[in-house]
């Protein structure tokens, strides 16, 4: 599960920092 989630974390962080 984590191995699928891990690549998404930087993508999510980038998207969130884009919003802010």
Swiss-Prot record:
Coiled coil: none annotated. Expressed by the skin dorsal glands. One of its GO terms (cellular component) is extracellular region. The keyword Secreted applies. It is found in: Secreted. The modification Isoleucine amide is found at residue 20. Keywords: Amidation, Secreted. Its main location: secreted. Disulfide bonds: none annotated. Has no antimicrobial activities against bacteria (E.coli and S.aureus) nor against the fungus C.albicans. This is Kassinatuerin-2. The lineage of its organism: Eukaryota, Metazoa, Chordata, Craniata, Vertebrata.
């Amino acid at each position: 599960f984590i191995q699928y989630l891990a690549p998404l974390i930087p993508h999510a962080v980038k998207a969130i920092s884009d919003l802010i």
